[in-house]
Amino acid sequence: MTVLRNEWRPVHARMLIGGEWTSSSQRIEVFSPARPDELVGTVPRGAPDDVERAIAAAKAAQPVWASKSYSERAQIIAPLLERLTGDIDERAALFVRENGKTTAEARAELAGVPSRQRLTLELAAELDQPHEADAPNGRSFVGYLPFGVVVSIVPWNAPVGLAFLQIIPALLAGNTVVLKPPETCPLSLIRAIEMIAPLLPAGVINVVTGLPAEIGDTLTTHPDVDKVAFTGSIPAARKIMANAAQTIKGITLELGGNDPAILLEDADLGDAAMERMAKSVYRMTGQVCMAIKRIYVPESIKGKFLDAFTRTVDKIVVGDGLDTNVTMGPMHTARALDRAQAIIADAARRDAKVQVLGQVPDKAGFGRGHFMQPTVVSDIAEDAPLMVEEQFCPAVPLATYRDVDDAIARANATIYGFGGSVWSRDIGRATDLARKLRAGTVFVNTHGTESVNRKLPYGGIKQSGIGRRAGIEGVREYMQVQTLTTFEQ
């Protein structure tokens, strides 16, 4: 693919099956969220037969790939990551067009893949070390086996970063991969695979594009698929779990969140703190699983907090992400925008206070695209959809509390358990309270995966997911324990 900012032509991508790039008679069109009449490109509308061939190719390639040591596989993977440092500006322009990110967000995601995954490769030496212990009349050893064929299904909001959080650990562990990119934002991810595929043996990584309704069941029920790694919505995960249960496949899920942020009376309301909080809420137009989705603030500081927070939010510049002055792009789809507007309207009907903020320099462009201004909703009912559901949009509800234990209880009263945060100048007290949040990843005075040490895992509990990404735990998601015991006379 060639993507030039000043000479734009639609990109027509292909599928990768058994080392061969292939197409199909039908195509899926990809349009720009900022300019919905602009065709960004197309991908093949793959069929179940394409999935069958990709799985067969992955299965055939897996034994030889698995026969290498972790260190040998790491040596093969390392040059892939170096390749992914190239063409960032060109690839970012494509990413912005198909996704709606800002240029800064697109560059950060693309550049973050090699830097993060180099840390994954550093774990190879640790993985090569078996654990052993005395056993009755002999010795016992603990080693690890790959699952085999892993299906990787990723969403549109961060497809490149999230895909490689699955692909690299899976490959390092000795698995082969069948990747299903998101149908509304597949091009940047396929471009990345084009860059690395020549360095891998045929069949080690395969790419099948298509509509979930047409190829999803084959991907998740096929008897030769040993594990499914999925990032996406809870309803889709339930269907995947049901499909995977037919053959008891391994499964890793990274799902939605409704993360609370609890401010204490002594919370820092200065510019830097408010910018960190606003970034967590409005990054990627609020279309992030681990982000602040609800704010709980003491009644005593509600006014001061709202003044400080809205002053920061009002500086956000909304528009086409190809403009480097823009700090928040459009919603990804018209359907997502309609839902966001509906749940905000519902809150308003319940007498909530809705503040529409931000700067819109290009008002004509704003009207054409799937744009929405950053919004703060206060005085909201606890059972309003904006509070209860994952809104996945640039709007955040604010509720007040008098007793911090009540705030913790309300924060935990959800099916979600991805992230949560406590904001206070008293780090010790905030840390103690953060540990009371029923979430897999918790924070003090910050909120988001970018704040987590990249050598450590993150993930959700409850209905926000199963398993972990990153760190040694993230690699072992793609490994199975094998215990070997010898009897020695």
Locate the predicted segments by residue.
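Conserved C-terminal structural/oligomerization subdomain of aldehyde/semialdehyde dehydrogenase
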Residues: 38-41, 225, 317, 367-489
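Structural signal for hydrophobic packing residues in well-ordered secondary-structure cores
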Residues: 62, 66, 81-88, 92, ...
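Residue-level signal for inorganic ion chemistry
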Residues: 37, 73, 95, 174, ...
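Short, well-ordered beta-strand elements within core beta-sheets of diverse protein domains
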Residues: 40-46, 61-67, 151-152, 262-264, ...
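A short hydrophobic/small-residue beta-strand
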Residues: 176-178, 354, 441
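N-terminal Rossmann-like NAD(P)+-binding subdomain of aldehyde/semialdehyde dehydrogenases
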Residues: 1-138, 332
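ALDH superfamily catalytic-core signature
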Residues: 10, 235-381, 444
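Rossmann-like NAD(P) dinucleotide-binding subdomain of oxidoreductase/dehydrogenase enzymes
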Residues: 85, 129-272, 401
